């Protein structure tokens, strides 16, 4: 490709609305342009990267035995009503009616569509197992699209769905998809972790996320410093303290705390160790309960894990925090003065709180706290559960080492769905015993557009993108200095361009009438891994300057050796 016949579209300045580095660099490198909130046009450079990612995904899915299909973006509403997700999905599901007043949705995912297909196409257990995938556009009407293509409304996704007559068969495909995903992200040159995860709104019994480690990530990824244990923070178990609860050394005292409405204010004003404080959060109880609210207690320096809390049988789903008005109607005190003593509603405490003694908490009286609270002396020990987020330094749940926490960007997710959708849509086949058998399902997703952004978040420097070789838009950039004034430079540039292309190497020849500084800046911004610079001065010595983008190292290579050298660098 020649720049004179290509839409380069690089920008010198960073657009003001681009927050994360991937969004900034994708705009500056001429990969994308914003059309509307959460909607982007992909320019030629972006499409080249996107296709590289797609091809790797497609190759590994095919290698794992999956079969490619293509399903409509537009889906009839009755399928979503049949599965029960019409109400569950909420406003992210874009709903509309056609000219015949028939309701439809823009598909954010395709469980319903593929299950409908299978229930009409398969009849016997002999046709299974099968695993279908597609690489196709999805739409989710995000309330706050942000971070460019990282959280856009329209995006490209690889989604796969497998069908089985046994859990053993599902596990085999699940393991194959786990291995395929690991190969996909390894081939792309990404630093990632596969972590245990919550199944969320899609449902199911088992789940793993594939997280690319990056400071800008929205998720906390938890892993052991000595073992293979890894989990999303939503799922990571917080182990109960091994040490027995210390004996009480203080009497419980009612203390006036009119200006301490938060744990931070309480700690600062009364010089308390934060580890000796407890915060109380009130959430709505499950429908039909004899109490409207449930009190959840965690240590002052810990955070409530909302996913764990929502799974408590007495807590309403989705988890909903009580308003001040609702709290006062039950406790007759404000949110900053709540605690376990004389709490008139059910209480659930975290494992760490259960091990505390001589602690401080609200007195359920405005402007007052109890200091020196002890379980079983001042208040009966209530129900104990794991309801907090783990923190760095906690023991690993597998008993090996301690936990580390890093930020991650979720780029892939695999689920064992079980029979959730096949039961709802009555997808069954004739089993080996001749009776109808409901199918067991798995689903496996990769955010193709998100992978591109995640790769940049992990691979950049002050000059621009530093692409892993496997997904770079071009492999080699040829920069001929003053080629329009030097016949020798022009002739060699054309010769090398032809020879490299003949070797199957993707080349960008910068044949613009631009200053060298502009040419260098653009190629580094775009992130092409290998650059060769042709100039009269070096050619006097039969030399060509070679530069590797990742480490910035330069070296002179003889003109006659440069093609062989590049082929070796790229193809090994």
Curated annotation (Swiss-Prot):
Keywords for the protein's UniProt record, in alphabetical order: Aminoacyl-tRNA synthetase, ATP-binding, Cytoplasm, Ligase, Nucleotide-binding, Protein biosynthesis
Keyword Cytoplasm assigned: yes
Catalytic reactions of this protein: tRNA(Pro) + L-proline + ATP = L-prolyl-tRNA(Pro) + AMP + diphosphate
GO biological process, one term: prolyl-tRNA aminoacylation
Major subcellular site: cytoplasm
UniProt-annotated location(s): Cytoplasm
Cellular component, GO annotation: cytosol
The protein's Enzyme Commission number: 6.1.1.15
GO molecular function ontology, one term from the record: ATP binding
Entry-linked PROSITE patterns: AA_TRNA_LIGASE_II (PS50862)
SUPFAM superfamilies (alphabetical): Class II aaRS ABD-related (SSF52954), Class II aaRS and biotin synthetases (SSF55681), YbaK/ProRS associated domain (SSF55826)
Keyword Chaperone: no
Family: Belongs to the class-II aminoacyl-tRNA synthetase family. ProS type 1 subfamily.
Self-association state and partner proteins as the record states: Homodimer.
Comment, domains: Consists of three domains: the N-terminal catalytic domain, the editing domain and the C-terminal anticodon-binding domain.
Function recorded in the entry: Catalyzes the attachment of proline to tRNA(Pro) in a two-step reaction: proline is first activated by ATP to form Pro-AMP and then transferred to the acceptor end of tRNA(Pro). As ProRS can inadvertently accommodate and process non-cognate amino acids such as alanine and cysteine, to avoid such errors it has two additional distinct editing activities against alanine. One activity is designated as 'pretransfer' editing and involves the tRNA(Pro)-independent hydrolysis of activated Ala-AMP.
Name used for this protein in its record: Proline--tRNA ligase
Organism: Escherichia coli (strain 55989 / EAEC)
Lineage: Bacteria, Pseudomonadati, Pseudomonadota, Gammaproteobacteria, Enterobacterales
Gene name tied to this protein: proS
């Amino acid at each position: 490709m020649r720049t004179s016949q290509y839409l380069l579209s690089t920008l010198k300045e960073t657009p003001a609305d681009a927050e994360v580095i991937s969004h900034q660099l994708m705009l500056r490198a001429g990969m994308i342009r914003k059309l509307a909130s959460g909607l982007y046009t992909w320019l030629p450079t972006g499409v080249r990267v996107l296709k590289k990612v797609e091809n790797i995904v497609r190759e590994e899915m095919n290698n794992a035995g999956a079969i490619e299909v293509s399903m409509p973006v537009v889906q009839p509403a009755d399928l979503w009503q049949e599965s029960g997700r019409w109400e569950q999905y909420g406003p992210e599901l874009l709903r509309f009616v056609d000219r015949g007043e028939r309701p439809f949705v823009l598909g954010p995912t395709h469980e319903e569509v593929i299950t409908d297909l299978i229930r009409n196409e398969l009849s016997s257990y002999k046709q299974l197992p099968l695993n279908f995938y597609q690489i196709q556009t999805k739409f989710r009407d995000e309330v706050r699209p942000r971070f460019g293509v990282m959280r856009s409304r329209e995006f490209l996704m690889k989604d796969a769905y497998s069908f089985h007559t046994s859990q053993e068969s599902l596990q085999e495909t699940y393991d194959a998809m786990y291995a395929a995903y690991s190969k996909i992200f390894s081939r792309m040159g990404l630093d990632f972790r596969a972590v245990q995860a919550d199944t969320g709104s899609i449902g199911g019994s088992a789940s793993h996320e594939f997280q690319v480690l990056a400071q800008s990530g929205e998720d906390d990824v938890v892993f052991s410093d000595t073992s293979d244990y890894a989990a999303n923070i939503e799922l990571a178990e917080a182990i109960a303290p091994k040490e027995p609860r210390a004996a009480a050394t203080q009497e419980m005292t009612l203390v006036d705390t009119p200006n301490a409405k938060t744990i931070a204010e309480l700690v600062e004003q009364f010089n308390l160790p934060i580890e000796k404080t407890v915060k109380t959060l009130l959430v709505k109880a499950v429908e039909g309960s004899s109490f409207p609210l449930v009190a959840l207690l965690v240590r002052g320096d810990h955070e409530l894990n909302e996913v764990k809390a929502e799974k408590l049988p007495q807590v309403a789903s989705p988890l909903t925090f009580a308003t001040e008005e609702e709290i006062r109607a039950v406790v007759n005190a404000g949110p900053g003065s709540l605690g376990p003593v004389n709490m008139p509603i059910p209480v659930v405490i975290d494992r760490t709180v259960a091990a505390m003694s001589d602690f401080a908490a609200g007195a359920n009286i405005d402007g007052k706290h109890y200091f020196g609270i002890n379980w079983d002396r001042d208040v009966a020990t209530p129900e104990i559960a794991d309801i907090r987020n783990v923190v760095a330094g906690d023991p690993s749940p597998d008993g090996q080492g301690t936990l580390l926490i890093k930020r991650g960007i979720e780029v892939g997710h695999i689920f064992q769905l079980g029979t959730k959708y096949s039961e709802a849509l009555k997808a069954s086949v004739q089993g080996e015993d001749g009776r109808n058998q409901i199918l067991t399902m798995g689903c496996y997703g990769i955010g193709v557009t998100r992978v591109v952004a995640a790769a940049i978040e992990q691979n950049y420097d002050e000059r621009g993108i530093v692409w892993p070789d496997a997904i770079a838009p071009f492999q080699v950039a040829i920069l001929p200095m003053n080629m329009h004034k030097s016949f020798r430079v022009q002739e060699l540039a054309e010769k090398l361009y032809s020879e490299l292309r003949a070797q199957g190497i993707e080349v960008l020849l910068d044949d613009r009438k631009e200053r060298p500084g502009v040419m260098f800046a653009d190629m580094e911004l775009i992130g092409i891994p290998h650059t060769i610079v042709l100039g009269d001065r070096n050619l006097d010595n039969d030399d060509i300057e070679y530069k590797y983008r990742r480490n910035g190292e330069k070296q002179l290579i003889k003109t006659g050796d440069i093609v062989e050298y590049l082929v070796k660098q790229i193809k090994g």
